[in-house]
């Protein structure tokens, strides 16, 4: 997925480069020059390296572990920049909507944070556990819990889940994730819709050999290929349960029947939303959500500067306020970092996104690996870090896999952490060996203030190594339309990508599978390496998550050391702040922001 709200659609990344990250003017000089010594980054990375486990029935039993000092009651004010475009689970794929969904929707599985809010386990949410695989991971069986109901009091049964998944094949759903649909159909892209083009709305159903509900409590998925990541995928908000009885098709997107601890009392698009308790939610069935707060009053159109100013002021209703997604803006970030009182009310962590400089392997001049290695060693990453706010907004990336991904291991084959300004001497030697000193490089960059800044700095570093760099701007609104073309004219250009769930299976295949090369796809460097392609097929068949994570890390190392089609630049981070009257404020590594489920009013 991409940084702007989490959409996979490639065009959305351009919004981050245009300023959506917001942290663009502070940090004391960026990589190599900031006062930040990286200790907090190392702590965050260490906590996020832990392998996410798949929980059993005991781990999936509610209620959620209590938060120390928490009490029930009160109202929390929530300042959001953007209104919610989608409330139908099937259409939810952006981070702000996912945060909301964690309060109002439930699925078969979900992420349970430990008492500190740091480690996570995939547990059964509406199901009794994280799933039972059979047939080598091609079949997964889920049993529903007792006492689970929608907000209207209707019991949740397997028929609702059949309806939930079948409607995803129809044109009612156009914006959400498509992993499970594609797996069930065993078809790439939008071809999955052919399996059930009208969804369940004209009386047709998926065959029992694909999706079976033999009784009211059992849901069975049948895949043609092993799907060891299914518990991860089902934990996405986009696969939360939809009421078969209450489905209003397109209208459901504005007024869904909820299943979480809250229901929507009122929603005025672009203005406000009020959440109140769902009296039919049973905490004994829920191992994930504490739901201490009685009411959430959400208002929209709060730019980062506005929400930061209000929360820093900590007066009136601001004392019991926060934002699920808004970050501390650039102007106030240094203030929050410098003031002990403000710092105590802030949380921070990595987001799932990794920046990378792509080397276009379709270009004849770039087929020489010595030239590619020269680019990799020469490229300075410090201009990119500085452009997006310095060390508080970005950490130097040594690898292609984010610290938020389960099983992450540190990597830095090009020595960027030791030499963020690049190593032009080593690069020039490689260029001399290749006989390519003075070689022209066409550098396509996004035409934003940040793009201007980092491309200038990076170009200077490449020139020191002996490249003739020609910078060419690309309009921000069409940036990813342009660079995702197979025959684009650029030798190097920057992109960013984040895992859809904490597994590198949502990083390596979409970005580096040579069989995915086509206009609009995300294999931006157009790498088509037989070993990588074979490894992708092999690892996708591994059902042991820890073993798969180890193997994905090996592919990461191979790509960087033997293929050299990309150069990692930065791991994205963010800082958020809450009013002093709010307790239970923790940074959730999966949501990539404050966890709404643990909050309470002091």
Regions inferred by a protein language model and the residue ranges of each:
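Long beta-strand-rich cores associated with HINT superfamily self-processing modules
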Residues: 44, 576-602
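Extracytoplasmic/peripheral linker and loop segments enriched in polar/acidic and small residues
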Residues: 62-65, 69, 212, 470-479, ...
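Alpha-helical secondary-structure segments
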Residues: 77, 156-166, 216-224, 260-261, ...
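N-terminal lobe/hinge region of extracytoplasmic solute-binding protein
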Residues: 77-135, 257
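Surface-exposed binding/hinge segments that line
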Residues: 143, 160-162, 167-242
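Structural transition elements
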Residues: 392-430, 450-453
